Swiss-Prot record:
Subcellular location: Cytoplasm
Protein name according to UniProt: Segregation and condensation protein B
GO BP term, pick one: DNA replication
Functional summary from the UniProt entry: Participates in chromosomal partition during cell division. May act via the formation of a condensin-like complex containing Smc and ScpA that pull DNA away from mid-cell into both cell halves.
Family: Belongs to the ScpB family.
The gene coding this protein: scpB
A single Gene Ontology CC term: cytoplasm
Quaternary structure and interacting proteins, as annotated: Homodimer. Homodimerization may be required to stabilize the binding of ScpA to the Smc head domains. Component of a cohesin-like complex composed of ScpA, ScpB and the Smc homodimer, in which ScpA and ScpB bind to the head domain of Smc. The presence of the three proteins is required for the association of the complex with DNA.
Source organism phylogeny: Bacteria, Bacillati, Bacillota, Bacilli, Lactobacillales
NCBIfam families xrefs: SMC-Scp complex subunit ScpB (TIGR00281)
């Protein structure tokens, strides 16, 4: 009979990029939440300790998924032939900060906060998988609403949006005298993540 870890790994594999929610695992594996969390932690440690394994287990918003590990990211990017070496612009960083803290938000609302047109930089974020359109606003023209993606959380090491540093009065205090914004200025660990964003 296969072990519970083997069963979990198989389910994660067939779930693919979409991942699998904790409640689904609870039903399929017939385990309580604490047991699932313990099992997931054991699998995480097993994958991390295996130098011949290029996978890792992530938990995002009570959903588990298998992804490629950071050690093989360059190879994976080369496989998909996606130009991720080009530095992301300061405008895109500002927009990403706004979307992260004000989502769901329309492009017009982003423009109003920044005072300039954001179309090009916003599309760059969509292309890079950090932001996506999700639904429309109940307003004239039904403009698209934008939110951050699971990849955004994954990239910066957050489990959910609740882990983002708290910024009071976002519209008024988060931009400096030059109109720039530091998305993760509140603490050291998050600040490191911001610099990682600049290197995208």
């Amino acid at each position: 009979m296969t072990s519970k870890i083997a069963q979990l790994q198989a389910l994660l594999y067939v779930a693919g990029d979409g991942g699998i929610k904790k409640e689904q695992l609870r039903d399929l594996l017939q385990l309580a939440d604490p047991e699932i969390e313990s099992l997931a932690k054991r699998l995480q440690e097993k994958l991390a300790s295996d130098l011949d394994c290029g996978l890792q287990l992530l938990e995002i918003n009570d959903e588990y998924k298998l992804t490629t590990s950071g050690e093989v990211s360059d190879l994976v990017e080369a496989y998909f032939n996606k130009d991720l070496t080009k530095n992301i612009s300061q405008s895109a960083l500002e927009i990403l900060a706004i979307v992260a803290y004000r989502q769901p938000i329309t492009r017009i609302e982003i423009d109003e906060i920044r005072g300039v047109n954001s179309s090009g930089a916003l599309q760059t974020l969509v292309w890079r998988g950090l932001v996506k359109a999700q639904g429309v606003k109940d307003a004239p023209g039904h403009p698209k609403l934008y939110v951050t993606t699971d990849y955004f959380l994954q990239y910066f090491g957050y489990k959910s949006l609740a882990d983002l540093p708290v910024i009071e009065n976002f519209e008024d205090s988060s931009f400096d005298a030059d109109g720039q914004v530091d998305l993760f200025a509140e603490n050291g660990t998050a600040d490191e993540a911001f610099h990682k964003m600049e290197d995208l």
